[in-house]
Amino acid sequence: MRFSDSVVLIFGGTTGIGLMTTIDFIIHNTSHIILASRSKWKWKRAIEKIQNIFGDLVNLSNEFNISVLNSTVEYIPCDIRIENDVKQTIQKTIDKYHYINVYFNNAGIQPTTGHTDGDITEIEIPSEKLFDGTIVYKISQNNSNNDNLNNDNSNNDNSSVCSTPASSYCENPIATFIMGMTFCLKHEVKFALEQKSNIPVSIINMSSRNGVNIPSSDRPIYSACKAFIHSMTQTIATQSAKLGIEKNRSIRVNCIAPGPILTPLEIPIFLPDKKNVFEPLSNLELQQFQEIGSHGVPMKRTGTTNEISPTVLFLADYNQSSYITGSTITIDGGYTASPLIG
């Protein structure tokens, strides 16, 4: 069986592409799948989605663990913006299962409100220099009364001026995509070099079409941060290959760059009036999403999550992609290949 001995850690695996990838790993008999994310309520929702697909084959072991077919799926609360969260999540997983051979760095945000992206003259990143010379950058946590930001019905997630309709956390692309990705790659490579089991390790990063060669002028910070992920994939792949040779380890680092995909994170971009992005779209909303989202896409449509997840599994599978590292695969209906198509 394809992934029968695999331990897969997905940062951001409870919704959208991450959840679809989780489902695909279950279908392919992955032994252990660990989902690390900030919102426990999204984990509960993910369980419901998995139950809708697999029905009575899903067994709830406890509130943080389910078993499905030949797989166990476990939830670990983790905020990748906090380095110790990342380190402890990986450490807990290795302590329990002894190794991790697939990492999917999929935690994502779509800043649509506040001052974390958009007009460069309006962006706010509070900073100050302390008496000892330390420079501190702050992520604000001001409360917001915007109903679009309160879809979780949870008292644990604090709404803020930089939240999004998909999350009531403060959504700063620099904190998640630059700091968070750096923390993930640092500890993934470190643990991959140190873990006892000498098995191939695949690290897959999530970038975007806007991070490859067509940045969004409406979201310069988001685009630049996604370009950072593309660049880091190449440099860390090179480092990991060299370090792996020294320690007799196979560590591959690759990246995917999707185009417009129907997910809770993408809906606010094309349907800004949609109040709850976790509810199914009406036929009219789906038509509007397709029309707006497919602008510039030669295939004249948006994509779906099940058109992304097979590429993640391909890169995760050493038998199929053992000579691929440092690559970014665009999955965008031809958008980046034909940027002038309207």
From Swiss-Prot:
One of its GO terms (molecular function) is oxidoreductase activity, acting on the CH-OH group of donors, NAD or NADP as acceptor. InterPro entries: NAD(P)-bd_dom_sf (IPR036291), SDR_fam (IPR002347). It comes from the Viruses. NADP(+) binds at residues 9-31. It is an enzyme of class 1 (oxidoreductase). The keyword Oxidoreductase applies. Substrate binds at residue 208. Its EC number is 1.-.-.-. Disulfide bonds: none annotated. Keywords: Oxidoreductase. The active site is at residue 222. Belongs to the short-chain dehydrogenases/reductases (SDR) family. PANTHER family: SHORT-CHAIN DEHYDROGENASES/REDUCTASES FAMILY MEMBER (PTHR42760). This is Uncharacterized short-chain type dehydrogenase/reductase R419. It comes from Acanthamoeba polyphaga mimivirus.
